[in-house]
Swiss-Prot record:
GO terms for cellular component: cytoplasm. Its main location: cytoplasm. This is Protein clueless. It comes from Drosophila persimilis. Residues 18-35, 988-998 have a biased composition (Low complexity). The keyword ATP-binding does not apply. GO terms for biological process: intracellular distribution of mitochondria; mitochondrion organization. TPR repeats lie at residues 1096-1129, 1222-1255, 1257-1290. GO terms for molecular function: mRNA binding. It is found in: Cytoplasm. Residues 38-50, 1417-1435 have a biased composition (Polar residues). Residues 420-662 form the Clu domain.
Length: 1435
């Protein structure tokens, strides 16, 4: 019943409201889509029931935390969120971090009495959500044949959501064609409940059955089919309908909240063989547990449309709409008529058409009722299906926002399904052929939603929800269209041209292929450049969408990789197809700078966006030698559509070029870079720097700017001017020297201890800087404006600012573009091309010199280690490091034994990417008839040692060599390779030209393991400048410790292959590992923008700041609000919702509510499995969190099962040699120890100790804990000597790290004393046996006390980084005041510098362009302090 409580606005609400806010046509579209789309119905189902299902229902929000709008961050802060669309809310890396993050839970001695000062502080924050929170109303719903149903609804909900609620309930789910009436008045589906005057609490809404139309009858049949196959996982394996898998309830055998606490002696805790330490290649079958029993009972043998359709004219006049054909489980065959009043059996047979009702006739408004009447088997099976359906968690039934594909799938039975067949061959999506205008106008929908008002919080929620809904539909349609294009099912709009130049329009979406059409990219790398251009263009669309300048429009863009092809799908600008491009473009250039146009409106709009994106306005000469001003790259085109909107497209050069990968005569790189092998000539000249790098670079320069300005301000305040001048002469070289040191001081081998020693000094410097600025500020403001201006000028010069008297860092993206003539400004000014080039060079150097070492240094602590290549790529991108630097990163990691796991993951990622390039080349030239054989052959060459013999008959080969192999081969035969992998690579490893590679559709048969490995080696050297120094894949596996199953998983996910779920023997010498039957499917790899929920993000980050200050309850309330807002925007199922749930579960646990933590974390696990994937790294971490909360709730056996699942998935993903495996093994060992399984426990803890020694060193706290756990286990086994030795190691580490007086050291000393006593006692007994041959009775017995569950939980908390400490109220106040003091110091520095600069620049007319807002800086400061406290307490 929880689903019926606390309703929130759903996605249907969005589209309904958006429609109402725009046009009636849109409203009609959404109405039709909602009715016909299973995805929308499912989303509305849980969404409409809101936070009771997904939000923490047990915690109520305090009224003091309410306001009219969420915490607002500045434009810069908003941008910093917008640039990484795939990034989750910051909780993944901050206060929540991961299982290793040490969190200090403060138990306040005053139980519930919060600090009044804190309450006052929160009251001053402008946080109120009265606009979203209402008391709700209780409404009675009367359904025909059912009892009166009472539900609580939000007044903001739409009537449509009551429809979805009823369609999900067991007793009313079979109804689809009905209206809702109040006092005999039919309610409008898109009306908000609060707008209905007669509706009040206690009102009764009546469900009235409506007559069917053709459309409604089809919708009803589709809904019945969905109900019957609700438990069938086939759609999830096939990757359709936005369905996906979850196995949590299979692992736990039901809802964890319904489980009773288990006694330790009743737990079956034996781990499966594949989970115990030492397994080399984990099996594949456990990845999908119990898949054979997932389908559920079969209710019908066949339900399909009849061949007698459509009804002839006379029968239409009798009300017939369509005919169905059914075979029941009793083998009876029925022909069914659908008429306006419902469904009935007619007298037709397979051979005879007789549409009259059968005798006796039975008419039912619901097809389910009719089938239950004629088939007892159907009635029983349907009841069983419904019972199982309602037992499933709500999150298991909701559609995901985007399709998640499985890389392994079982053999699925292919059943008769008319609706599936109809969907496969219909040209539209679902029921869209019935909406006005036939097809959706994607561009109009995308742009209209962006134009919705955004001034108030409800308006912003409606707008963001509408954007998200339309974008999700567009991605689904674009993906389906791209697959249809590559499969040859769409006619080109220019069919007479060469196949690689063909373009397509399907469902109002424009599709183009990743080839260099008309030599457009000839000077930039040809097809290589054409292949990567869509990806860079997508980056540009993403950042301009994030900036969200009103009046500036981008195209809906999706990039799809499928079967070796890259397809770009874009919405269509109104009118662009009616005229030539030369006539359309009013801004930018269509020929890379030969002709350049500008437009005042575009300059105005792009100048606004450029402030956030750090793009420098610049001027270039056009073909008539006239200067033309631009506020973007030359390639960026501005087109005014027929709708009057200003569109920008071709945003591939939004950010400046990466000179480290361009060989340019005018660029002289530093000696350090040259020694590292730069510049490297890349395959294309479109390499650009990432936005994250530019932000980090500007932030670094800003810190230096403040430091230098502070030093000069101190000089201004000196008592004697003469001394000041002489000091200035001394200080200036010192500052420059400090700058030099600052560049070089980032040593990746710096130890944590060294880092801690530096902290107090930095704090003192910061305080001195603040004091100096404060003292100087008054002088600057009154009489020292000239001197202040000089200070700013010197600081700007020292950091290389683009402006002489203002901190300004913006980049010219065209500065190194060939063929563009720049208007050169005065030397030293922002218009100086030389200065612009130097800045871009400095940013590229910053990446290599600072960011790569910073990346490595960050992972030295192993606090949140990457688990697979996807994790690694995300981490690199967050530091602004492009994947083309992977070779350089690998070289750095290879010199560090403590980074061995990351080195292995990076090498595997490089091998997978190199293999992808080669694989795509062969797939393009493969005949469609032989795709499965070709793919299995390629996998055999990549992964196995057995004989490789592709099965293709010689006759067929010779016959096909002469022809083009049909429609598909027409694409492939002329295209050859594309993009990064465009030219095929011949057997000797050399590249051939595009034409020669495409000549043969059977090139794949010539691939051998040896030739493939040689190509991979050449690719790794050519693309990443890294020597893969192994002579075969086998030697590489052994050298780097890579498992074949891990490589198979990574490669399948990377290129979109689905293999059969079975065990593969990679070492077979007699037959190939893969056969053509092992290739189940090929799925698309889709790249798109993820719309964001800005208000939810602001609440989330504010909540994080509270948590970092120790204000857990306030943080919980803010993050709960963030989750509510996310539910409003994204619906119940989204990655960011999962991050919020994980954080809330952790906070509940820290606040002492383990049961609430378990309930919330269970939802987080299901959500992660559904939206990320069942073996995604995030899912693995969610499982480990859930196991801890399960143990805390007394579910000991479940806790072990969850840990076994997490360990299996982790080993399948990256192998056993990983710091995260050490954490899981420590948890497993401790729980097994508590259950008395000492031998098993010892195996796991020995493995954990081995890994901890390797990755943390022999003096680390992790190692001390592992030694202590081993000692405890061995003492329980009676092996006191070994226990004593291990506890001595623990004592030694504690003593050296913490000192003799520390509590942990004293505890270890006491443990040593007890072990020594037991060891002496045991020795006495042994001596007695040896001397007397029997035991004497006077020796006391050896007593081994098993640990209590409380002590085990305490130790589990310690291992997982959670430490509960008792702190007095005075200490809490002291810590908070210290945090506030540091925050204030940071704020004062910024404010003082800004004021001083403003005074120096014409009495405050200019301002410093700081790289980030104060909120972010404060959060960083709080995080820094919290981290320091963590170390101290966890020690």
């Amino acid at each position: 019943m929880a689903l019926e409580m606390d309703s929130k606005n759903s996605n249907s609400a969005v589209t309904g409201d958006a429609a109402a806010a725009t046009t009636k046509t849109n409203k009609a579209k959404e109405n039709n889509n909602l009715a016909g789309s299973k995805k929308n119905q499912s989303q509305n189902l849980v969404n409409g029931n809101g936070t009771a299902a997904d939000g923490p229902a047990t915690k109520k929000k305090g009224k003091k935390n309410r306001n009219k709008s969420p915490p607002v961050s500045t434009d810069e802060a908003a941008l910093s969120n917008g640039h990484v669309e795939e990034k989750k809310p910051e909780g993944d890396g901050d206060a929540d971090a991961d299982a290793n993050a040490n969190v200090v839970a403060v138990k306040d001695e005053k139980a519930e009495g919060g600090d009044e000062a804190d309450a006052a502080e929160l009251d001053t924050e402008d946080i109120d959500l009265d606009a979203l929170h209402d008391a709700g109303i209780h409404v009675n719903i009367s359904c025909p044949g059912s009892e009166l149903l009472t539900v609580q609804l939000s007044s903001m909900e739409l009537v449509q959501e009551i429809h979805q609620l009823l369609m999900d309930r067991e007793e009313s789910c079979h109804r689809t064609c009905f209206s809702l009436q109040l006092d005999n008045v039919t309610l409008d589906n898109f009306a908000e409940l609060k707008t209905i005057e007669q509706l009040e609490s206690g009102s009764t809404i009546k469900v009235v059955e409506e007559p069917y139309t053709m459309r409604e009858a089809r919708i009803h049949v589709r809904h019945v089919r969905d109900l019957l196959k609700n438990l069938d996982p086939a759609d999830a394996y096939n990757g359709i309908e936005c369905t996906s898998l979850t196995y949590l309830n299979t692992i736990t055998q039901g809802d964890l909240l319904d489980k009773k606490k288990t006694r330790p002696d009743s737990v079956d805790c034996t781990p499966p063989d594949y989970v115990t330490p030492g397994v080399f290649e984990p099996p594949l079958l456990p990845l999908h547990p119990n898949f054979k029993n997932a389908k559920g009972p079969q209710a019908l043998k066949v339900l399909t449309t009849s061949a007698w359709n459509p009804p002839p004219g006379p029968r239409k006049l009798h009300g017939d709409l369509m005919y169905l054909y059914v075979i029941t489980m009793e083998e009876k065959r029925y022909h069914i008529s659908a008429c306006s009043r419902g469904f009935f059996i007619n007298q037709s047979t397979d051979d005879t058409f007789n549409p009259k009702p059968d005798n006796p006739s039975y008419l039912s408004h619901s097809l389910i009722d009719l089938l239950s009447h004629i088939s007892p088997s159907f009635r029983r099976a349907f009841q069983a299906i419904q019972k199982r359906r309602t037992l499933r968690h709500a999150f298991e039934r909701v559609a995901t926002p985007y399709q998640v594909y499985q890389w392994a799938a079982p053999n699925l039975e292919h059943t008769v399904d008319a609706i599936r067949a109809e969907d496969a061959f219909s040209s539209k999506l679902g029921y869209e052929e019935h909406i006005p205008g036939q097809t959706r106008d994607w561009n109009e929908e995308l742009q209209t939603t962006r134009e919705l008002p955004r001034k108030t919080l409800p308006e912003r929620l409606l707008r963001e929800r509408a954007i998200f809904k339309v974008h999700g539909d567009f991605v689904t349609a674009a993906t389906r269209g791209a697959m249809a294009v590559i499969d040859g099912n769409v006619l080109a709009i220019n069919p007479g041209e060469d196949s690689k130049m063909q373009m397509f329009i399907w469902n109002n979406i424009f599709f183009s292929l990743g080839f260099d059409v008309r030599d457009h990219y000839k000077e930039l790398g040809g097809d290589y450049a054409a292949y990567v251009a869509p990806r860079y263009d997508l980056h540009g669309v993403r950042v301009y969408n994030a900036v969200d300048v009103e009046g500036l429009y981008t195209l809906g863009t999706v990039v799809i990789d499928y079967r070796g092809y890259r397809v770009t799908a874009q919405s269509i600008i109104p009118g662009i197809l009616e005229r030539e491009q030369e006539q359309s473009v009013v801004y930018g250039s269509i020929d890379f700078g030969k002709t350049v146009l500008s437009h005042p409106k575009y300059l105005e709009l792009l100048r606004q966006a450029g402030k956030h994106l750090k793009i420098l306005p610049h001027s270039v000469y056009n073909e008539r030698d006239e200067p033309v001003e631009l506020c973007s790259s030359v390639e960026c085109k501005g087109i005014i559509g027929n709708d009057g909107r200003h569109y920008i497209l071709d945003l591939l050069r939004t950010f400046p070029p990466d000179v480290n990968f361009l060989k340019l005569q005018e660029v002289k790189l530093s000696t350090e870079l040259v020694e590292m092998g730069f510049p490297i000539e890349h395959r294309h000249k479109l390499c650009c720097l990432r936005q994250e790098l530019l932000e980090a670079f500007v932030e670094d320069r800003y810190v230096n700017f403040i430091r230098i300005a502070a030093v000069h301000l101190q000089q201004l305040n000196a008592k004697k001017p003469e001394e000041t001048q002489s000091e200035e002469k001394k200080q200036l070289p010192a500052i420059e020297e400090a700058e030099k040191e600052n560049k070089e001081n980032l040593n990746v081998n710096e130890t944590p201890n060294e880092k801690e020693k530096d902290t107090p000094v930095e704090t003192k410097n910061a305080e001195a800087m603040v004091n100096a600025i404060r003292e100087a500020q008054s002088n600057v403001a009154t009489s020292n404006e000239i001197q202040a201006a000089e200070v700013v000028k010197q600081a700007c010069a020292a950091v290389g600012s683009m402006k002489e008297k203002e901190f300004d860092f913006r980049f010219n993206p065209d500065v190194f573009s060939p063929g563009i003539r720049h208007v050169d400004g005065e030397e030293g000014t922002s218009g100086s091309v030389a200065k612009q080039k130097l800045l871009v060079q400095d940013a590229a150097e910053f990446l290599v010199v600072k960011q790569i070492p910073a990346f490595v240094k960050e992972h030295l602590s192993h606090s949140s280690p990457p688990i697979d290549g996807q994790n690694l790529t995300e981490s690199l991108h967050s530091h602004g490091i492009n994947v083309r630097y992977l070779g350089k990163v690998i070289k750095t990691l290879g010199q560090m034994p403590r980074m061995d796991y990351l080195y292995r993951i990076a090498v595997m990622e490089l091998i997978v990417r190199a293999t992808k390039h080669i694989y795509y080349t062969y797939m393009q030239s493969t005949d469609p008839m032989h795709l499965s054989v070709a793919i299995s052959h390629f996998l055999n060459c990549l992964l196995t040692n057995g004989p490789i013999n592709p099965v293709v008959s010689n006759d067929e080969m010779h016959k096909k060599r002469g022809g083009n192999g049909g429609k598909h081969n027409k694409h492939k035969s002329s295209k050859g390779g594309k993009g990064q992998q465009q030219p095929a690579i011949n057997q000797n490893g050399g590249s051939t030209t595009s034409s020669s590679s495409s000549a043969n559709a059977y090139d794949w048969t010539l691939v051998t393991p040896r030739s493939l490995w040689q190509q991979i080696r050449k690719e790794s050297k050519a693309y990443w400048d890294w020597d893969l120094d192994c002579d075969s894949m086998d030697s590489a596996m052994n050298k780097f410790g890579i498992m074949r199953i891990c490589l198979l998983r990574a490669f399948c996910l990377k290129v979109g292959i689905q293999v059969l779920l079975r065990e593969y023997n990679f070492d077979s010498k007699h037959k190939p590992t893969f056969g053509d039957d092992d290739i189940v499917n090929v799925f698309p790899v889709v790249k798109h923008i993820s719309p964001r929920a800005s208000d939810a993000y602001n609440f989330y980050t504010t909540g994080q700041a509270k948590i970092q200050q120790g204000l857990f309850k306030e943080g919980y309330e803010l993050i709960s609000e963030a989750l509510n807002l996310l539910n409003n925007v994204f619906g119940a199922m989204h990655q960011e919702n999962g991050s919020c749930l994980r954080m809330l579960a952790r906070l509940s646990y820290l606040l002492g509510d383990a049961q609430d933590a378990l309930a919330i974390q269970q939802r987080a696990v299901i959500m992660s499995e559904r939206v990320n994937g069942i073996d995604n790294p995030s899912t693995i971490l969610e499982y480990t969190h859930l196991s801890l909360y399960s143990f805390a709730n007394g579910h000991v056996g479940m806790s072990l099962k969850l840990l076994y699942r997490a360990r299996y998935l982790l080993v399948l993903t990256c192998g056993e040699d990983h710091p995260e495996v050490a954490l899981i093994d420590s948890n497993i060992s401790l729980i097994l120890h508590a259950l008395g399984e000492y031998e098993l426990s010892l195996r796991f803890i020995e493995h954990a100790l081995k890994l901890n020694l390797k990755y943390f060193g022999n003096k680390a706290m992790h190692v001390a804990v592992s030694y202590h756990l081993m000692a405890r286990t061995q003492s329980c086994m009676g092996d006191f000597r070994s226990a004593l030795n291990n506890e001595k190691e623990t004592y030694s580490i504690y003593k050296s790290q913490l000192g003799e007086k520390h509590e942990k050291t004293r505890d270890s000393a006491e443990c040593l004393r007890l072990l020594t006593q037991q060891a002496v006692l045991l020795q006495r007994k042994m001596n007695d046996i040896y001397s007397n041959g029997k035991l004497t009775s006077d020796l006391p017995p050896i007593h081994i006390t098993p640990p209590s569950m409380g002590s085990v939980l305490e130790m589990l908390n310690t291992i997982n980084g959670i430490l509960f400490v008792q702190i007095s109220q005075r200490d809490i106040v002291k810590v908070r005041s210290e945090i506030e003091k540091r925050m204030k110091a940071n704020t004062d520095v910024n404010e003082a510098i800004k004021s001083m600069v403003a005074a120096a620049n014409n009495n405050g007319e200019s301002e410093v362009l700081a790289p980030q807002d104060n909120n972010k800086e404060q959060a960083a400061t709080a995080q820094q302090l919290t981290n320091g406290d963590k170390v101290a307490v966890s020690s």
